[in-house]
Amino acid sequence: MDLRRWFPTLYTQSKDSPVRSRDATLYLLRCVFLMGVRKPPAKFFVAYVLWSFALNFCSTFYQPIGFLTGYISHLSEFSPGEFLTSLQVAFNAWSCSTKVLIVWALVKRFDEANNLLDEMDRRITDPGERLQIHRAVSLSNRIFFFFMAVYMVYATNTFLSAIFIGRPPYQNYYPFLDWRSSTLHLALQAGLEYFAMAGACFQDVCVDCYPVNFVLVLRAHMSIFAERLRRLGTYPYESQEQKYERLVQCIQDHKVILRFVDCLRPVISGTIFVQFLVVGLVLGFTLINIVLFANLGSAIAALSFMAAVLLETTPFCILCNYLTEDCYKLADALFQSNWIDEEKRYQKTLMYFLQKLQQPITFMAMNVFPISVGTNISVTKFSFSVFTLVKQMNISEKLAKSEMEE
């Protein structure tokens, strides 16, 4: 099978190929379309609406309700391990549904961001610069498929381990289905739960990976922009007016970068904030399940779930730290350009521009948390607090004892 033919943007194009930064989100936006949150195409209007209803009803709306209803109606029938397996996913399912609704409301901003990437592309002329963008595009798409693989491995592992022991993966509540009554009901409920969870994982990939896809290609443009700033004033045959025009063009380039960031900021702020709220709790329940209750199959599924949860915030938080460093490099590059012997107008404009470049690009989670590695570590450490609390209160022993008595 020729993957290059079917997935060309997974591979780095030659430096002579035209630049298309928007290809960094090619597969992401195709999957966003399959989430059913786009305007239905005229040709497949009915099919798209039906698909959108089925996926979002099962994964976005009913699944969080099904978890809660299942706890209310059948809590006494859960073993401690089964309850924690279900609970860790329930919190993540509730957060996933919230993130999907945020992206659904703001999905047009992805198209606006891609239009701004097209503006940045028009400034790319050098073959070396084109190659740099091509590398960012291929890396971005490979990361998207890596996310998809990790999330889907979790959903499938949980499904298979549950079927092996003869129970539905999460024991959600479905009207008219009692999986204890017959093998047919068990198969139907397990299939429904797997469809809902696979759909939720598919949605989660899109709402978790889009910041990484967009910021990766932004960093490539910022690296090229830094070299453009460093070369200011070094062209010997330019007049003073031409040098000034080149500086003004760089200021315009920086404004496009800021518009790109401002375009994505509301979406990123909402989705990352939601994830920060639940990541510590979810990881804490997962640790308790792995250490105290899980059998081998459940432990493998829980470990893959933990990897998926860590992917939801960690890569983007790392990129945010790198993005801050990139901004400081822009200021250094401008200061290193040949400006000392230029005219007063050029120097004043450059100094004003330098002050703007020294203001780093940062993302905030609903103006509450700065999105950074430090914040990610802080919220992740909360999982150890949850684990320690459960250990000190001997909750695990009490749960195990109650299960033995039953």
From Swiss-Prot:
Top-level taxon of origin: Eukaryota
Coiled-coil region(s): none
Alphabetized GO MF terms: ionotropic olfactory receptor activity; odorant binding; olfactory receptor activity
Residues listed as glycosylation sites in the UniProt record: 394
Residue spans, topological domain Extracellular: 66-86, 164-181, 293-298, 381-406
Gene Ontology terms: biological process: detection of chemical stimulus involved in sensory perception of smell; olfactory behavior; signal transduction
One protein family per Pfam: 7tm_6
Cellular component GO terms held in the UniProt record: cation channel complex; dendrite membrane; plasma membrane
Keywords tagged on the record: Cell membrane, Glycoprotein, Membrane, Olfaction, Receptor, Sensory transduction, Transducer, Transmembrane, Transmembrane helix
Compartmental location: Cell membrane
Topology in the lipid bilayer: Multi-pass membrane protein
Cell membrane is among the record's keywords: yes
Residues on Cytoplasmic side: 1-44, 108-142, 203-271, 320-359
Transmembrane regions listed in the UniProt entry: 45-65, 87-107, 143-163, 182-202, 272-292, 299-319, 360-380
InterPro entries for this protein: 7tm6_olfct_rcpt (IPR004117)
Family indicated by similarity: Belongs to the insect chemoreceptor superfamily. Heteromeric odorant receptor channel (TC 1.A.69) family. Or2a subfamily.
Physiological role: Odorant receptor which mediates acceptance or avoidance behavior, depending on its substrates. The odorant receptor repertoire encodes a large collection of odor stimuli that vary widely in identity, intensity, and duration. May form a complex with Orco to form odorant-sensing units, providing sensitive and prolonged odorant signaling and calcium permeability. Involved in the behavioral responses to butanol, ethyl acetate, propyl acetate, and pentyl acetate. Also responds to pyrazines.
More info: The atypical heteromeric and topological design of the odorant receptors appears to be an insect-specific solution for odor recognition, making the OR/Orco complex an attractive target for the development of highly selective insect repellents to disrupt olfactory-mediated host-seeking behaviors of insect disease vectors. Odor-evoked OR currents are independent of known G-protein-coupled second messenger pathways.
Official protein name in the record: Odorant receptor 42a
Gene source species: Drosophila melanogaster
